[in-house]
Every structure is written in C-alpha cells, then in structure tokens.
Regions:
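Low-complexity repeat regions of mature extracellularly deployed or surface/particle-associated proteins
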Residues: 1-148
Length: 148
C-alpha cells in the first residue's frame, strides 16, 4: 500500500486483511491525493489479487472502494476537480473491474458489482453528472457510461 498526500487535511484509510483467498497474495492499494480535504477509504478483504488505485486532485473529493473476497477485483478511480464522489463495491469477484474518471466538479459515480467477470467504465466531465452501475448475477457483463 502506498499513500502520497500533498495539501491540507487529506484523509486516507486503507484496510487489507487475510490474504487467504486462493492461497493468498497481492493486495495493493495506491492512494495519491493533491489538494485539500480529500478523503479516500479502501477496504480489501481475502485477496489473491484485489488492486485499487485512487488519484484525487482538487478539493473535497471522496473515494470509497470495497473489494471483498477477490480472486481479482480491480478498481481505478481518477478524480480531478472539486466535490466529486466515487463509490465502488465489488463482492465475491473472480474478476471484476471498475474504472471511474471524473473531471470537473460535483460528480457522483457509484458502481456495485457481484458475480463473475463484471466490467464497468464511467467517464464524467463538465459538472454535476450522476452515474450508477449495478451488475449482479450472471457473468461477463459490461457497462459503459460517458457523460460530457
């Protein structure tokens, strides 16, 4: 886990546990925050993969990532602006991937994935865009939202 913060009153909380899934191994989290009053919370449980990256530039941005049983589960959040919120919950996995890119201000992106081989891509620019992806059951689902 690598946390790099530049600015004032940024908060980063990373919890990585067990490393037991499939023989255990690899649970990474990279949090980079530049600006003021940004918050990032990453929770990764049983692992054998589980990589999460959070990049936040600006102020008052919030990123929450929960990856539970893993066997892959990749989350990448990039927020460049102010007052953006990104929430990712990936449970039970066997490969799930979420990529959220937000530029501008006051965006909200929420991704909930359960089941196998779920892929989610959300890209938001300008201001105040809202997107929610919920993928459960089945396998091989893909969702893309582009808001400009």
């Amino acid at each position: 886990s690598v946390i790099v913060q530049s600015g004032n009153e940024n908060i980063a909380t990373v919890s990585q546990e067990n490393h037991a899934y499939g023989g255990g191994d690899i649970t990474e989290s990279h949090v980079y925050q530049t600006g003021d009053l940004n918050s990032a919370t990453v929770t990764q449980n049983n692992s054998k993969d589980s990589i999460s990256e959070v990049f936040q530039v600006g102020g008052y941005n919030t990123a929450n990532v929960i990856q539970i049983d893993s066997g892959s589960s990749v989350s990448n959040i990039l927020q460049n602006g102010n007052d953006n919120i990104a929430n990712v919950t990936q449970t039970n996995s066997a490969y799930s991937e979420s990529i959220i890119t937000q530029t501008g201000d006051s965006h909200l992106a929420t991704v909930n994935q359960s089941g196998a081989s779920q892929i989610s891509l959300i890209t938001q620019s300008t201001n105040a865009a809202i997107a929610t992806h919920s993928q459960s059951g089945g396998a091989g689902n893909s969702a893309t939202t582009l808001q400009y």
